From Swiss-Prot:
Family according to the record: Belongs to the ThiG family.
Top-level taxon of the source organism: Bacteria
Complexes and interactors: Homotetramer. Forms heterodimers with either ThiH or ThiS.
Pathway membership: Cofactor biosynthesis; thiamine diphosphate biosynthesis
Name this protein carries in UniProt: Thiazole synthase
Gene responsible for this protein: thiG
MF term (GO), any: thiazole synthase activity
GO cellular component, as recorded: 2-iminoacetate synthase complex; cytoplasm
Residues at the active site: K95
Amino acid sequence: MKDSFKLGNKEFNSRFILGSGKYSNELINSAINYAEAEIVTVAMRRAVSGVQENILDYIPKNITLLPNTSGARNAEEAVKIARLARECIQGDFIKIEVIKDSKYLLPDNYETIKATEILAKEGFIVMPYMYPDLNVARALRDAGASCIMPLAAPIGSNRGLITKEFIQILIDEIDLPIIVDAGIGKPSQACEAIEMGVTAIMANTAIATANDIPRMARAFKYAIQAGREAYLAKLGRVLEKGASASSPLTGFLNGVE
């Protein structure tokens, strides 16, 4: 049975979005293939010819590129980077990252809302990275966001679902794809997030810092698939107290001498 999701006018089957920020160009192709990802994020500084070797030469042509506005400190800078990305990559997808906190690398939600509103009006498929907050998520939705991308934990920390309860609120209240971005450190954490009902997972550091990058990419792929199967199957009830036997406790020995 088909189990896809839509962003803008495109449909995707893989729920694993791969970040490319920490790989060598030579390894990115292998990671994509093992992950079977259909969307790959790219920072514009690695995609602009002449700055350094172009990462785009290593990404298969059938992959949807998701440029990000990494380096933007406010809405104005994010909009400039997004427009440059459209010109260079010839696509409308853009991941909004507005970060002026250099210690914790937390997104500036309010500048993100401003950038989202401007870029959505210009026809971009806007995917905003944000700190999970219901009111901000509603504002992003109303501004024209195509999805909501809450962080699980600070960027690059690999600490897992620290914001789990807040992400669950977004799943329950926001009628847009919820894509968990940043902080997922293990395949099991990706599986748990998908079991909760998030649409997809974006991961980068957990894979890029593994000893065996292709194998870790594949592990994340299988974990995300398992989480989705569990979500669709509907998880069994949880007993707060006591126990419930899985086999009959009486009657088996009746009549046995």
